[in-house]
Amino acid sequence: MGALEAERAANNATALETQSSPEDLGQPSPLRKIISVASIAAGVQFGWALQLSLLTPYIQLLGIPHKWSSYMWLCGPISGMIVQPIVGYHSDRCESRFGRRRPFIAAGVALVAVSVFLIGFAADMGHSFGDKLENKVRTRAIIIFLTGFWFLDVANNTLQGPCRAFLADLAAGDAKKTRVANACFSFFMAVGNVLGYAAGSYTNLHKMFPFTMTKACDIYCANLKTCFFLSITLLLIVTFSSLWYVKDKQWSPPQGDKEEKTSSLFFFGEIFGAVRHMKRPMVMLLIVTVINWIAWFPFILYDTDWMGREVYGGNSDGDERSKKLYDQGVQAGALGLMFNSILLGFVSLGVESIGRKMGGAKRLWGCVNFILAIGLAMTVLVTKSAEHHREIAGPLAGPSSGIKAGVFSLFTVLGIPLAITYSIPFALASIFSTNSGAGQGLSLGVLNIAICIPQMIVSFSSGPLDAQFGGGNLPSFVVGAIAAAVSGVLALTVLPSPPPDAPAMSGAMGFH
C-alpha cells in the first residue's frame, strides 16, 4: 500500500500543478498596471501595522495577562493555513466574468470592514452587553475583540494571496517583471506601515472623530478606533480604484478539464501531498522561509510590548503611573516602526539593483539575515542598558535620550532585512512555480503555510518561554537571533539560484 499511496500523492501533486497553471497571459503588462495593483498593499498594511503595534497592548488593557496574550496570535497562522491555500487554489480556477483574482480581493475588503468594526467597538459593545467598567477583565469585550481579530486575519489572507497572484499574472512569467512587481508590493507595504505606525504613535488622533471616545472607550481605545476608520477608508480607495483600472481576464479551463472539476476539489491531504512532491527549489525555499520567520515573528509580535515593558519599564497591569509609562513605550515603539518602514520603502525600490550588485537574490537574502541576527541580539544590550539607567535614575524615570536613540536606530536598521523578506521569497516562489507549471495562487498559498507554521511555533512557545525567564520578551528575541543566523547560512548554501531572466518581449516596454 505504501507504493500505491506514494503514487497517488504524486498524481495529486501533478494534478494540482497542472490544474492550477495560469493561462497563457501573453506579454507582461505595463508597469503602471503592476503599480496600481501593488498599491492595494498600502491599504492592507495600514491595518496590519495597527494590528501589530497596538492590539497586543490593547488586549492586555482589556484584561488578558501578558503570558497569555501570545495565544491571541494563533488566529493568524491557523486562518492563514486554512484560508490562503483555499483562496489561492480557487482563485487559480475562478471562472467569474470579473476575472480570477478580483472577486476574492473584493470579498477580502468586505471582511476587513466587518472586522474593523468589531475590533474598534469591542469595548463599547462589551459594556452594552454587561461588562462592568470597574472589572479588571472585560470578558464580553474580549470575546468580541477576538472575533474581530480572527476576521481581520481571515480578511488579510483573503486579500494578500490573490493580490500577489494577480501581480504574478500581470508579470506573465517574466522573471525580472516578477521581481519588480514584488518589490513594488513591498514598497507599498512600507507606505502602509509608515501611515499605520504614524497614526498609532499620535496620541490625539481621536479628536478627528470626537464620537469615538465614550464611557467604555478611553483615549487609547478612541485612538485605536480612529486609526481603524482611517485604515478602512484607505483600503477602500486603493482597492476599488485598482480593480476598476486593471482588468482581470476571465479564465476558462482547458478542453477536457470541465469533466474532472468535481473530482479535483481542494483537500488538505492533496495539498500536503503536493508539498511532498514539489521540485527541490520550492522545497528549499519553504525550509529557509520557515526558519527565517521563526526569527522575525518574536520581534514583529512583541516589539511595542518590549518597548513598554523592558525599555520604558512600564506595566500594563500596574498602577496609573506604570500604565502611563507602558503606553508611552508602546507609542515610542510605533514611532520606531514608522522609521523602520521608511527605510523599508526606500530599500524596496532598490531590491532589483542591490540584488544584481550582490550576485543574486539568494545571496542578498542570506546576507541581510545576518543583519537581522545582529539586530535581535542587540535587544539584549538595549534592555540591560535601560535597566541599568532605571537603577540609577529611579524605576519610573524612563529611558535616557541615548537609549532612545539606540532603540530607534535598531528599529530603523531592521527595515533593511524586512524589505528583502517582504519581496524576494515571494518573487522566488512565483519564479519557481512558473518554471514547474504550478499555479501562482496555489504556490503562494503553500508559501504562506511556511510563514504560518513559525507564527504558531512562536505563539505557543513565547509565552511559556518568557515566563520561565521572568516574564520579559528577551528569550524569544534571542531565539530569533539564532534562527536568523541559521536561515542566513541556509539561504547562502542550500537555496538554489533562480533561473536567468526571461528574454525581453516586444510588449514589455509599456512603462509609460
Swiss-Prot record:
Extracellular compartment spans: 55-67, 124-140, 201-225, 303-333, 385-406, 462-473
GO cellular component terms, A-Z: plasma membrane; plasmodesma
Membrane topology label: Multi-pass membrane protein
Gene Ontology BP annotations: seed development; sucrose metabolic process
Pfam families linked: MFS_2
Changes seen on gene knockout: Significant but transient reduction in fatty acid concentration in developing seeds. Slight delay in embryo development.
Tissue: Widely expressed. Expressed in the endosperm and on the epidermis of the outer surface of the cotyledons of torpedo-stage or older embryos.
InterPro entries per record: MFS_trans_sf (IPR036259), Suc_symporter_pln (IPR005989)
Subcellular location: Cell membrane
UniProt function note: Responsible in a heterologous system for the transport of sucrose into the cell, with the concomitant uptake of protons (symport system). Can also transport biotin, and probably maltose at a lesser rate. In planta, the role of SUC5 for the transport of sucrose seems to be negligible. Plays a role in the nutrition of the filial tissues during early seed development and is probably involved in the import of biotin into the endosperm and the embryo epidermis.
Name this polypeptide is given: Sucrose transport protein SUC5
Organism (species): Arabidopsis thaliana (Mouse-ear cress)
Taxonomic lineage: Eukaryota, Viridiplantae, Streptophyta, Embryophyta, Tracheophyta
